[in-house]
């Protein structure tokens, strides 16, 4: 079979807008993209390997330049043919939803993988391992999926005119956007529309997923993130609509928020995070909300879990906690709602369905900085920044570390150092490595497992740093004082 005929088969299989009668038409569409010389190009039975063959042929035929951006733009164009139009996708999704939410999401997820929008091969490169801690098994990932930028594309982007369209990577305007050297190709991207709080929102999957069925729910309007009562209402509405998914929001302040504060959005998916498995340590009473169970979660960060079958009462209770926290100051533990009139408090909320009940976890956040901790008082401190210095956002709050790609090679050098072998270990790891060398015996047989455990302990410390009420006696007494204010 040829690469062209194989891809025609993929298009007909995935896109109900085409049948085998369209084979000649589709062949000519493909030849226009990759060059007539590719007509008899031998194919591969695997659709993504077959895609690679066509892209390589297009480059050899002079249809695209030799750059990463050009290859990705063509990949998306070739897979766009295998993807139903946005209106058709939405019709099919909501038709399938009638048979059950899971039927619809399973179909949309499978399509988003098959059409290469979800970068399955890149995601498979990520390093993932569990780490036992006093808070349960944390999930450690070293994120290798996002490709390094091609120097040619960086140079081209520097000279390209800035259009400002699409406004950001989360905008509805990305749907079908061809892409350019400084903006990802999105021709094969599709977004499900739905109403949330009387406004149009979109639902899509993340192309570089950090966990199973990593979904993004985004406001149709490009407006900044905000945490208020409508946030809790929206999150509970989403888990009512998609009960097999959790959904949460990043905080709406710098340092404690995510990397995208300019566009209102939530993240969710079908994954049970370590925080969701963590037990309640202490029950808490929320004034005026007798039908809401509340408690402090056994977790390195400061989390109040609210549970109720009554979503309206749960929303009101969550808003009460948020408002009290937003005004709460305790100088004895460096917790300050305002400094010079500037607000520092917000929450990272996470919603899920558990049987007939709703759960809302509210993670208390404070984004102050100080001379001692210029990156953030409640942010990874200097001594753990050799492993993690970036913001602690929603996914990490829940117990899944997203560590930078540099660590794969850097930790390999640390392992050599621990084994007494020649190495090029970075100086920033030396203090930590010397502590590990003094405390444990290191052999070629145990070095990998012990290194993973050590990284897990550092991540637990990172989360403790981000916790506003520390796990020691002073911190827990301060947490109890806050809970009494509720």
From Swiss-Prot:
Q: Which UniProt keywords apply?
A: Carbohydrate metabolism, Cytoplasm, Galactose metabolism, Nucleotidyltransferase, Transferase
Report the EC number(s), separated by commas if there are several: 2.7.7.12
Q: GO terms for biological process?
A: galactose metabolic process
Q: Report whether Cytoplasm shows up as a keyword of the record.
A: yes
Could you tell me which NCBIfam families the record lists for this protein? Answer: galT_2 (TIGR01239), PRK05270.1-3 (NF003630), PRK05270.2-2 (NF003633)
Q: Which family does it belong to?
A: Belongs to the galactose-1-phosphate uridylyltransferase type 2 family.
This protein is called Galactose-1-phosphate uridylyltransferase
